Regions:
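Canonical Radical SAM [4Fe-4S] cluster-binding loop centered on the CxxxCxxC motif
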Residues: 1-21
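Short microdomains enriched in Cys/His and/or Lys/Arg
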Residues: 20-35, 235
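Short, small-residue-enriched loops and turns at beta-alpha junctions
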Residues: 50-54, 81-84, 148-152, 180, ...
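Auxiliary Fe-S-binding modules of radical SAM enzymes
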Residues: 171, 179-269
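Short amphipathic alpha-helices and their capping/turn segments at secondary-structure boundaries
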Residues: 29-33, 84-98, 129, 158-168, ...
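Alpha-helix N-cap and loop-to-helix initiation/capping positions
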Residues: 21, 54, 58, 118-126, ...
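Conserved C-terminal portion of the radical SAM core fold
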Residues: 125-184, 200-225
């Protein structure tokens, strides 16, 4: 059961302790952020697991507790595209009139054979339906794509990016495939290692992806963080500054920028 690449933390390996109240978790996260940055405003991110999978009354209490804090300026809710029933959509639309509400959907790929392999449990059609329902209610969508899934070529990955570019998506998180200890993907990798991106290959692909996306689309993530204690591969991904610097060099060296090849079918990578 569950997706093939998810750790026991349900993609929330860096989140505050879920045993605390929402207010307590936000306070803990603020302390951590203040050590690194000088930020004064925050986005409340409901990240781990499926954050719309509860009775609507429970969800209302959790979301409004977060939104009630004056320095919380937006709510970002990560969930599955098949866990957005009408009553939850109506709640999100209502809260969106108070402060901006974003919904994050983990599509990962548009290719059905890969969706089956990673055990996503939903289809591309269900994702499209969820985006339409959210868009109709004025709720912004952030879509996650994973680059480097086994069995996919770079052309397959660029096709997923082109698909997002053609749909009403506010933002995107481009995520390098991390192979983690304690996941089914990790077991597969240890038994029969499959090819993973080198730093240069990944940054080359990211430059392509940025060129294909609309200039107004918000890029929320370019690589992602795998928890060091669980990360089997690729180890180069732990040096985030080096990754970002390499992406900048690729863009400059190839004279690329976000949107350069948007709607230009002459570009095929």
């Amino acid at each position: 059961g569950g997706c093939i690449f998810c750790s026991a933390g349900g993609s929330g390996d860096f989140a505050a302790s879920p045993q605390q109240s929402v207010t307590g978790q936000i306070a803990q996260a603020k302390l951590l952020l203040r050590e690194k940055t000088n930020c004064r405003k925050y986005i409340a991110y409901f990240q781990a697991y499926t954050n719309t999978y509860a009775p609507v009354g429970v969800l209302r209490a959790l979301y409004t507790e977060a939104l009630a804090q004056p320095d919380i300026v937006a709510l970002s809710i990560a969930t599955r595209c098949d866990c957005l029933p009408p009553d939850v959509l109506d709640l999100l639309a209502e809260l969106n009139t108070i402060k901006p509400v974003w919904v994050e959907l983990g599509l990962q790929t548009i290719h059905e054979h890969t969706l089956r392999f990673i055990r996503s449990g939903f289809s591309l059609a269900q994702y499209k339906q969820a985006v339409s329902a959210l868009h109709a209610r004025g709720i912004k969508v952030i879509t996650h794509l994973i680059l480097g899934l086994p069995g996919e070529t770079t052309d397959d990955m660029r096709a997923s990016v082109r698909y997002l570019a053609a749909h009403p998506v506010f933002g995107v998180k481009l995520q390098l495939l991390h192979v983690l200890e304690g996941t089914d993907l990790g077991t597969l990798y240890k038994n029969d290692p499959f090819p993973l991106f080198t730093l240069e290959e990944y940054c080359d692909l990211i430059a392509d992806c940025l060129a294909l996306l609309p200039p107004e689309m918000v890029i929320h993530r370019l690589t992602g963080d795998g928890p060091r204690r669980l990360l089997l591969a690729p180890q180069w991904s732990t040096d985030k500054k080096r990754v970002l610097n390499t992406i900048h060099r690729q863009l400059a060296g190839r004279d690329l920028w976000q949107g350069k090849y948007y709607r230009n079918e002459e570009f095929h990578g």
